[in-house]
């Protein structure tokens, strides 16, 4: 079984020790050090942002080469103690951003959450500030449906942001992430508790990916050359729908789940969410990270105790 990185709750001390092993005898990182300039991580106190910071440290990036931007920089104290710069920055307050990004060479622009406000406008504020601050390369966390030509709905904001970045004049990389699989643990636990899953041939099947794998992909792009002006589909290894979720949960928990036909007039969202535009799997993650993406089965195996607890 592949070792899913999402199960690792590694201490920062261990991350630094791992990073030290990557460092050359001269004290500089062989592929991820200061020579590439400082890396700005927006949304650094969020779930994805925090994982990216830990990945960067584990890859040997000195904390002093990190500029961590957040609306709540007080939550970044653990990284500040290691030497990272922590700064306030709010995409809705454009006046805060040039100072927040100052001194950076690369920017990981983590998209703000759906429903958190007008995303293209907020992202444009960040892009304009990045250009003004002299950022040379923007890495953006986009959405996989764009790769199949989807430019409306959930993909619309991301498509508009991608276009703004491409027009900015700086180098770019689009990380078109699929939907996080982490949330499937709760869904699977409910199936186990009920002993039943409602499925349909109309169910959408999605290349779910763990948040941890998305962080690994971002860190890989930020610390290695050759990713300029390229778009990557960051997905899990398999297309997954309710049927496959139930089968994986049953196998891991050792408890049967009956597959029952979904009602014809059941919620459209359970069958149509994402649609064909979300039916994407790719080897891009493996090319960037040097390992295969975590499967839903592996995710469930790592959270077996949680599955069993929720099934009671």
Where are the regions a protein language model picked out?
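N-terminal export leaders
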Residues: 6-15
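Structural motif detector for alpha-helix initiation sites
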Residues: 8, 211, 242, 295-296
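C-terminal segment of classical bacterial N-terminal signal peptides
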Residues: 21-29
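Oxidoreductase cofactor-interface core, primarily capturing Rossmann-like NAD(P)-dependent enzymes
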Residues: 35-70, 74, 92-95, 100-102, ...
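Rossmann-fold cofactor-recognition segment
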Residues: 80-93
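Short glycine-/small-residue-rich Rossmann-like dinucleotide-binding loops
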Residues: 112-113, 304
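A hydrophobic C-terminal alpha-helical subdomain
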Residues: 253, 263-312
């Amino acid at each position: 079984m592949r070792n899913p990185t999402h199960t690792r709750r590694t201490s920062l001390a261990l991350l630094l020790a791992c990073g030290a092993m990557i460092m050359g005898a001269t004290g500089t990182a062989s592929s991820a050090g200061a020579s590439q300039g400082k890396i700005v991580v927006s949304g650094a106190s969020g779930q994805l942002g925090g994982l990216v910071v830990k990945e960067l440290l584990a890859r040997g990036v000195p904390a002093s080469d990190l500029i961590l931007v957040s609306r709540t920089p007080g939550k970044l104290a653990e990284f500040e103690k290691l030497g990272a710069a922590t700064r306030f920055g709010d995409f809705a307050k454009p006046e805060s951003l040039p100072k927040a990004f100052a001194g950076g060479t690369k920017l990981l622009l983590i998209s703000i959450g759906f429903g958190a406000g007008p995303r293209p406008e907020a992202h444009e504020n960040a892009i304009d500030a990045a250009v003004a601050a002299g950022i040379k390369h923007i890495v953006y966390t986009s959405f996989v449906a764009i790769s199949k030509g989807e430019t409306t709905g959930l993909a619309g904001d991301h498509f508009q942001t991608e276009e703004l970045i491409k027009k900015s004049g700086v180098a770019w990389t689009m990380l078109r992430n699929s939907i996080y699989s982490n949330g499937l643990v709760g869904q699977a636990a409910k199936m186990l508790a009920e002993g039943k899953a409602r499925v349909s041939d109309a169910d959408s099947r999605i290349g779910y990916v763990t948040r941890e794998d998305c962080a690994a992909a971002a860190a890989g792009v930020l610390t290695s050359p050759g990713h300029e002006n390229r778009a990557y589909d960051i997905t899990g290894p398999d297309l997954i729908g309710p049927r496959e979720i139930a089968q994986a949960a049953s196998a891991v928990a050792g408890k049967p789940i009956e597959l029952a036909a979904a009602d014809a007039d059941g919620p459209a969202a359970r069958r149509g969410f994402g649609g064909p535009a979300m039916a994407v799997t790719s080897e891009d993650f493996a090319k960037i990270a040097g390992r295969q993406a975590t499967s839903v089965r592996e995710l469930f195996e790592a959270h077996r105790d949680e599955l069993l607890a929720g099934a009671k």
